[in-house]
Amino acid sequence: ITVPEQETAQNPMNLIASIWLCGVAVLLVYAAVSYVHIRRKVRESVRIEGNIYICDRIQTPFIFGVLNPRIYLPSSLKEVQIKNVVAHEKAHIRRLDYLWKPLGYVLFAVYWFNPFCWLAYILFCRDIEMACDERVIKDWSAEQKKEYSLVLLSFHVPGKMITVCPLAFGEVGVKQLSLIHI
Protein backbone atom coordinates (compact mmCIF):
# COMPACT_ATOMS: atom_id res chain seq x y z
CA ILE A 1 0.00 0.00 0.00
CA THR A 2 1.39 3.38 -0.93
CA VAL A 3 0.53 6.63 0.74
CA PRO A 4 -0.44 9.36 -1.68
CA GLU A 5 2.21 12.06 -1.96
CA GLN A 6 -0.22 14.81 -0.97
CA GLU A 7 -0.99 13.13 2.37
CA THR A 8 2.72 12.71 3.15
CA ALA A 9 3.42 16.39 2.51
CA GLN A 10 0.59 17.45 4.82
CA ASN A 11 1.56 15.09 7.61
CA PRO A 12 1.93 17.23 10.77
CA MET A 13 4.85 15.10 11.96
CA ASN A 14 6.83 16.06 8.85
CA LEU A 15 6.20 19.73 9.56
CA ILE A 16 7.15 19.36 13.22
CA ALA A 17 10.29 17.40 12.35
CA SER A 18 11.26 20.04 9.78
CA ILE A 19 10.83 22.86 12.29
CA TRP A 20 12.81 20.94 14.92
CA LEU A 21 15.61 20.21 12.44
CA CYS A 22 15.74 23.87 11.40
CA GLY A 23 16.09 24.88 15.05
CA VAL A 24 18.92 22.40 15.60
CA ALA A 25 20.63 23.60 12.42
CA VAL A 26 20.34 27.28 13.42
CA LEU A 27 21.88 26.63 16.85
CA LEU A 28 24.71 24.50 15.45
CA VAL A 29 25.44 27.05 12.72
CA TYR A 30 25.48 29.75 15.41
CA ALA A 31 28.05 27.72 17.35
CA ALA A 32 30.18 27.22 14.23
CA VAL A 33 30.05 30.91 13.27
CA SER A 34 30.88 31.92 16.85
CA TYR A 35 33.81 29.51 16.84
CA VAL A 36 35.19 30.93 13.58
CA HIS A 37 34.68 34.50 14.81
CA ILE A 38 36.59 33.91 18.05
CA ARG A 39 39.25 31.88 16.22
CA ARG A 40 39.89 34.87 13.94
CA LYS A 41 40.08 37.23 16.92
CA VAL A 42 42.75 35.17 18.69
CA ARG A 43 44.74 34.28 15.58
CA GLU A 44 47.39 36.89 16.33
CA SER A 45 47.58 36.26 20.07
CA VAL A 46 50.98 35.87 21.68
CA ARG A 47 51.88 32.99 23.98
CA ILE A 48 53.19 34.26 27.30
CA GLU A 49 53.47 31.00 29.25
CA GLY A 50 52.25 27.41 28.86
CA ASN A 51 48.71 27.55 27.50
CA ILE A 52 48.24 31.25 28.36
CA TYR A 53 48.00 33.77 25.53
CA ILE A 54 47.58 37.52 25.39
CA CYS A 55 45.49 39.17 22.69
CA ASP A 56 44.83 42.77 21.63
CA ARG A 57 41.47 41.98 19.99
CA ILE A 58 39.54 40.75 23.03
CA GLN A 59 38.02 42.64 25.96
CA THR A 60 37.54 39.84 28.49
CA PRO A 61 39.54 36.72 29.41
CA PHE A 62 38.26 33.31 28.34
CA ILE A 63 39.18 29.69 27.64
CA PHE A 64 38.92 28.52 24.07
CA GLY A 65 39.30 25.04 22.65
CA VAL A 66 38.03 21.56 23.34
CA LEU A 67 40.99 19.32 22.55
CA ASN A 68 43.66 21.83 23.56
CA PRO A 69 42.10 24.45 25.86
CA ARG A 70 43.95 27.75 25.94
CA ILE A 71 43.55 30.72 28.23
CA TYR A 72 43.26 34.03 26.39
CA LEU A 73 43.83 37.28 28.26
CA PRO A 74 43.13 40.77 26.94
CA SER A 75 46.23 42.91 26.55
CA SER A 76 44.45 45.58 28.63
CA LEU A 77 44.59 43.31 31.68
CA LYS A 78 46.52 44.87 34.54
CA GLU A 79 49.31 42.94 36.22
CA VAL A 80 47.40 42.77 39.52
CA GLN A 81 44.41 41.18 37.77
CA ILE A 82 46.32 38.41 36.02
CA LYS A 83 46.76 36.15 39.08
CA ASN A 84 43.04 36.04 39.84
CA VAL A 85 41.95 35.68 36.23
CA VAL A 86 44.42 32.88 35.51
CA ALA A 87 43.39 31.08 38.73
CA HIS A 88 39.75 31.24 37.60
CA GLU A 89 40.46 30.03 34.06
CA LYS A 90 42.75 27.23 35.27
CA ALA A 91 39.96 26.05 37.58
CA HIS A 92 37.75 25.69 34.49
CA ILE A 93 40.41 23.51 32.89
CA ARG A 94 40.88 21.35 36.00
CA ARG A 95 37.12 20.84 36.22
CA LEU A 96 36.99 19.85 32.52
CA ASP A 97 34.40 22.57 31.90
CA TYR A 98 35.76 22.97 28.37
CA LEU A 99 34.24 19.51 27.68
CA TRP A 100 31.05 19.87 29.72
CA LYS A 101 29.93 23.17 28.25
CA PRO A 102 29.97 22.05 24.59
CA LEU A 103 28.17 18.85 25.60
CA GLY A 104 25.55 20.94 27.38
CA TYR A 105 25.20 23.10 24.28
CA VAL A 106 24.68 20.07 22.04
CA LEU A 107 21.90 18.88 24.36
CA PHE A 108 20.45 22.39 24.32
CA ALA A 109 20.55 22.42 20.50
CA VAL A 110 18.76 19.06 20.28
CA TYR A 111 16.06 19.99 22.81
CA TRP A 112 15.78 23.68 21.89
CA PHE A 113 12.00 23.49 21.60
CA ASN A 114 11.61 22.88 25.34
CA PRO A 115 11.60 26.16 27.30
CA PHE A 116 12.97 24.33 30.33
CA CYS A 117 16.00 23.41 28.25
CA TRP A 118 16.71 27.11 27.66
CA LEU A 119 16.48 27.72 31.38
CA ALA A 120 18.57 24.63 32.15
CA TYR A 121 21.35 25.75 29.79
CA ILE A 122 21.44 29.25 31.27
CA LEU A 123 21.55 27.84 34.81
CA PHE A 124 24.15 25.25 33.74
CA CYS A 125 26.46 28.02 32.47
CA ARG A 126 25.89 30.02 35.65
CA ASP A 127 26.56 26.98 37.84
CA ILE A 128 29.79 26.23 35.98
CA GLU A 129 31.01 29.74 36.81
CA MET A 130 29.88 29.55 40.43
CA ALA A 131 31.50 26.13 40.98
CA CYS A 132 34.69 27.44 39.45
CA ASP A 133 34.65 30.49 41.74
CA GLU A 134 34.04 28.28 44.78
CA ARG A 135 36.96 26.06 43.86
CA VAL A 136 39.33 28.99 43.44
CA ILE A 137 38.47 30.84 46.65
CA LYS A 138 37.76 27.96 49.04
CA ASP A 139 40.97 28.42 51.07
CA TRP A 140 41.42 32.15 50.61
CA SER A 141 41.16 34.92 53.20
CA ALA A 142 38.31 37.43 53.15
CA GLU A 143 40.61 40.06 51.65
CA GLN A 144 41.73 37.71 48.84
CA LYS A 145 38.08 36.82 48.12
CA LYS A 146 37.18 40.49 47.91
CA GLU A 147 40.04 41.20 45.50
CA TYR A 148 39.06 38.17 43.38
CA SER A 149 35.43 39.30 43.28
CA LEU A 150 36.30 42.82 42.23
CA VAL A 151 38.59 41.59 39.46
CA LEU A 152 35.97 39.23 38.03
CA LEU A 153 33.21 41.81 38.32
CA SER A 154 35.30 44.24 36.30
CA PHE A 155 34.78 41.91 33.32
CA HIS A 156 31.02 41.50 33.75
CA VAL A 157 28.96 42.49 30.72
CA PRO A 158 25.42 43.43 31.80
CA GLY A 159 22.44 42.25 29.80
CA LYS A 160 23.96 39.02 28.47
CA MET A 161 22.43 35.73 29.57
CA ILE A 162 23.85 33.11 27.23
CA THR A 163 27.54 33.18 26.53
CA VAL A 164 28.69 34.46 23.18
CA CYS A 165 30.29 31.20 22.07
CA PRO A 166 29.23 27.79 23.32
CA LEU A 167 32.85 26.60 23.08
CA ALA A 168 34.45 29.42 25.09
CA PHE A 169 34.29 30.47 28.75
CA GLY A 170 34.26 33.86 30.35
CA GLU A 171 33.63 36.11 27.37
CA VAL A 172 30.45 37.27 29.06
CA GLY A 173 30.91 35.99 32.57
CA VAL A 174 28.24 35.39 35.16
CA LYS A 175 29.93 36.27 38.43
CA GLN A 176 27.10 36.20 40.98
CA LEU A 177 29.07 34.14 43.48
CA SER A 178 31.66 36.88 43.60
CA LEU A 179 29.10 39.25 45.09
CA ILE A 180 28.31 36.81 47.87
CA HIS A 181 31.89 36.76 49.13
CA ILE A 182 32.54 40.50 49.22
Segments predicted by a language model, with ranges:
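Membrane-embedded and juxtamembrane structural elements of multi-pass membrane proteins
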Residues: P4-H181
